[in-house]
Amino acid sequence: PMTDDTARHNEKMAKKKAARDKIMATKSGEKGLIVVHTGKGKGKSSAAFGMIFRCIAWDMPCAVVQFIKGGMESGEKKLITEKFADICPFYAMGEGFTWETQDRARDIEMAEAAWEKAKELIRDTRNKMVLLDEINIALRYEYLDIDAVIAFLKDEKPPMTHVVLTGRNAHEKLLDIADLA
């Protein structure tokens, strides 16, 4: 039997559904997102690797480029390189955090090489997602030109490719173009 509470609830939910349907009608459908994981706490790379593992689980080609942590071992790197390298190539391009290397010219060279690899992987439309792990550090220390990175993401990222960028202190310009941050 329909009670007054049930009727009110149904009416309220019908209004919510109509409002939600109106919002969803304005959405342009699926597209590849630019996602920035930044902040002071831990978990930025872990969250991004969760997204990569989801791609792997659904047999969606993806790729990882590590900008800074290249010399460091991690469970994510071990699992991907040993078990899923065919669907998710993993490029550890850095040599460690800059305060460990203390060689700015070498850090810039490594960051530029990582960025070239990243662009190649992003342009490859087979990749549904590309993770640029710790790129925000490379941008913060000006190892890469923020305007060049922004221009590439805006102008050359294929429409259905997701690009995930991690690291503390994300540049304001990067946050401005992000779909999720």
Task: Annotate each predicted stretch with a short phrase.
Residues 38, 52-56, 84, 128, ...:
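Generic hydrophobic/packing signal
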Residues 17-20, 112-116, 163-167:
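Short gly/ser/thr-rich secondary-structure transition/capping motifs
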Residues 33-123:
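Conserved P-loop
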